[in-house]
Amino acid sequence: MSRVAKKPVSLPKGVELNVQPELISVKGPKGTLTLQKPVGVEIAIDGDVATLSANDPSQIAITGTVRAILANMIKGVSEGFERKLELVGVGYRAAMQGKDLSLALGFSHPLVFVAPEGITLSTPTQTEILVQGADKQRVGEVAAKIRGFRPPEPYKGKGVKYAGEVIIRKEAKKA
């Protein structure tokens, strides 16, 4: 069995794990997440600990993947995930219009981004965007989509970047 799958997953208080023949659902204070259970992966719940095992040697690799996804689901419904974006550039601003995000990124028109269900967008300052949600994958997808509107360019570093992201700069062409 894979090293990841051998490690049991602990269930914090307030989190409920429900395993059905083809579906795994995790319910907690931040919402409910579901996952299609792969064939050949067994989940045993013992109190506040869940252990995974593969009943087929060909399913050993997927067992570790399911364990990692399950751990992220449990963390998501109990604590949640967030991704912070920064806007770098003159006139680059973000503002909330109700539940929609309005971005001024140097185009002739402002971009309006509608937050998908289960994702919360907020702007602590005009140059920061906070993407929050219970599903780690969807939080990352939404953050990547917003970053994709104006990715950072290597000459001046202008654009939308993740907080803490290092942009490798290039030197301008000499005449």
UniProtKB/Swiss-Prot annotation:
Record GO terms (molecular function): rRNA binding; structural constituent of ribosome
GO cellular component: cytosolic large ribosomal subunit
Coiled-coil portions: none
Record's signal peptide: none
GO biological process entries: cytoplasmic translation
Keywords from the UniProt entry: Ribonucleoprotein, Ribosomal protein, RNA-binding, rRNA-binding
Matching InterPro entries: Ribosomal_uL6-like, Ribosomal_uL6-like_a/b-dom_sf, Ribosomal_uL6_a/b-dom, Ribosomal_uL6_bac-type, Ribosomal_uL6_CS
Record-stated family: Belongs to the universal ribosomal protein uL6 family.
Known partners and oligomeric status: Part of the 50S ribosomal subunit.
Function in brief: This protein binds to the 23S rRNA, and is important in its secondary structure. It is located near the subunit interface in the base of the L7/L12 stalk, and near the tRNA binding site of the peptidyltransferase center.
Protein name (database record): Large ribosomal subunit protein uL6
Originating species: Xanthomonas campestris pv. campestris (strain ATCC 33913 / DSM 3586 / NCPPB 528 / LMG 568 / P 25)
